[in-house]
Amino acid sequence: MTKSRVLLANVHIMMAYAFRSLERIDDAPRSTAEFEHLHDLLAEIIVSETSRQVKRGLDHGYREETRELQTVRGRIDLQGSIRQRSFVRGELVCRYDEFVADTDMNRAVRATVLLLARHGNVAPQRREALARLLPFFAGVRAVNPQAIRWKDLQLNRINASYRWLLAACELTVKGLLPT
């Protein structure tokens, strides 16, 4: 396949029209880049959108945890404490909500970044850029890209900035994985 030069602004503007977010047209990069394969173009979009999202802050959510603790945190699970005999060790079983970055959207982004970095036809510099993004997803557990339910990822006004990123991720996963 031959290399083709693509004006990134054109791709950015087409995405802005496709997602009805015309306010993003002004953010379009003014450079051109060479892409040998479609994976290269998608990797560039994912790198720029993920970097943008990391700067804004990753989406966080609450996950319920149950642990034996020496101090009270959240609600005391009296039945669990009796069952595990925590009182003998001077501990209590507590149920509490933990504010974590391990959300469905972050799992989808992490899975896509890993998929592109490992299996995509991506230029070495973009592969390195993808690898540099992974430490930001250290607290996010890995999932199988085929198991991602794209329709179940709910966007609201708080996480609406994920819209472009998730669309690029879905395109990448559906294009890279055999059906």
Language-model features: where?
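Terminal, charged accessory segments of proteins
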Residues: 1-178
